[in-house]
Amino acid sequence: MRETLYDFCIRTGQQTLLQEWDAKQNAPLTPKDLSYGSKKKVWWRCAHGHVWQAMVTIRTANHSGCPYCSHQRPWPGENDLTSQFPKIATQWDMEKNASLTPEMVTRYSNRCVWWRCEKGHSWKTPVRTRTHAACGCPYCAGRKVLKGFNDLFTCMPEIAAQWHPTLNGTLTPYDVTHGSKKKVWWICEQGHVWCASIASRTGGKRCGCPVCAGKVKAQKQAYHAKMIAEHKKNDR
């Protein structure tokens, strides 16, 4: 047999491995019975009382430690989502996540799970995005559009009425949030056409038709009219 785990730890000064050897669960096996490169899975117990299984070679070659102390695995009441971020854990979608619970993931897990906010919006995102980046519901925050809740037509129908029917292609007022920075085409009651971001129309300034407001020169408006005429011609 190659050098035993016991001799290896003494020679390399890694007595911590001997201290973490779970004598009770591994009995009658001892560190003197296995080589330091053994692929046998044995039990370990860290100084904080966490218990786990790992191959001997994983511990000696990779210098891996307790998966709970390093937050690679959840330990209920210590590093799980519920105990560390109880408020966020209340938005855990129990139905869509099936048997997975907030106690089964670490607080900064990269695992993608389902959430449901107080208003009933459902979305999927990694646990870490919620706890580390402090991101909440994307619909309530206006980062994603939800028809009937934060889309332009629902929130500001009077502005949506000026949405150009052809120049925006298949995009409709239902497909964008009322605070979107996306630039789209508009047409006023007088038939003037212009391009502006949705946010500039719905924000504090509530910018309307620049032609009616006298902000656009006749030359520029004529150019827009020519371009639109060519667009209609190409669509035929």
Regions from the PLM with identified roles:
Residues 1-236:
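Functional cation/ligand-contacting sites centered on basic and imidazole/sulfhydryl donors
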